[in-house]
Amino acid sequence: MMRTIKVGSRRSKLAMTQTKWVIQKLKEINPSFAFEIKEIVTKGDRIVDVTLSKVGGKGLFVKEIEQALLNEEIDMAVHSMKDMPAVLPEGLVIGCIPEREDPRDALISKNRVKLSEMKKGAVIGTSSLRRSAQLLIERPDLTIKWIRGNIDTRLQKLETEDYDAIILAAAGLSRMGWKQDVVTEFLEPERCLPAVGQGALAIECRESDEELLALFSQFTDEYTKRTVLAERAFLNAMEGGCQVPIAGYSVLNGQDEIEMTGLVASPDGKIIFKETVTGNDPEEVGKRCAALMADKGAKDLIDRVKRELDEDGK
């Protein structure tokens, strides 16, 4: 009897595209499973008119989906790794981390003007504190204007509203089939450190589902898994959500060691903590990077930013 695996997904075009891609790959690994997609609307999808940092950070796009997993209404879910909270509900696991897409941020501007050449006070659209803080480190004169909506909506707003440029994740553009020529320039990690897990997917399931976990083990990419787990350990130790400008990105160096860079900044980009740590164990590398930065005052900064946001929200 062929097992039908119910897959939970957000409704957005990007989420559905990612989910269908994962299903296709899993069918190639083992054709003896059937798959059925169940669309789930999350809190983050329902709130469209405020910045994410004001409505409670991480987990906004996954909570309802995780509830459906716990209730056994679905068997697995495909998420963007950067939407995943650092700690999962009991009984659930990230069963699989496929190969990572491009982790960089992409700048798309009117008339293809590069960041360094933009006029003083140019208006940049982003709804990410991490991106805006790092843009302001490089160009303190820029005006940051919040922007929400899917890729198509944002590209349209760039054309019709008073934005000089917008910043999007390169991975999302690529998965949605946008050609690289829409991008004015890719921001290298040295200039704009990516969000933890940016460009990677997380496939979540119940810890007890051995059949699915066995299937997933054939689809996990070891390089991505090691590097992303270090980033997530850093995020967890820093207790950072969407509410603070926090970034973490890892690569494997020539010696096959994890090289992890973490960043915490004030929203205006005036205070920056940045450290790079090398080691073999993802959990240890992430924690050590966080501890180094906490010693220098990064943790105090996070607490202060959270307090200020709470007061703003009242």
From Swiss-Prot:
Coiled coil: none
Pathway linked to the protein: Porphyrin-containing compound metabolism; protoporphyrin-IX biosynthesis; coproporphyrinogen-III from 5-aminolevulinate: step 2/4
Annotated keywords: Porphyrin biosynthesis, Transferase
Catalytic activity of the protein: 4 porphobilinogen + H2O = hydroxymethylbilane + 4 NH4(+)
InterPro entries, A to Z: HemC (IPR000860), Porphobilin_deaminase_cofac_BS (IPR022419), Porphobilin_deaminase_N (IPR022417), Porphobilinogen_deaminase_C (IPR022418), Porphobilinogen_deaminase_C_sf (IPR036803)
Broadest EC class assigned to this enzyme: transferase
A biological process from GO: protoporphyrinogen IX biosynthetic process
Cofactor: dipyrromethane
Cofactor note (record): Binds 1 dipyrromethane group covalently.
E.C. no: 2.5.1.61
Function statement: Tetrapolymerization of the monopyrrole PBG into the hydroxymethylbilane pre-uroporphyrinogen in several discrete steps.
Quaternary structure and partners: Monomer.
NCBIfam families linked: hemC
Miscellaneous notes: The porphobilinogen subunits are added to the dipyrromethane group.
Protein name: Porphobilinogen deaminase
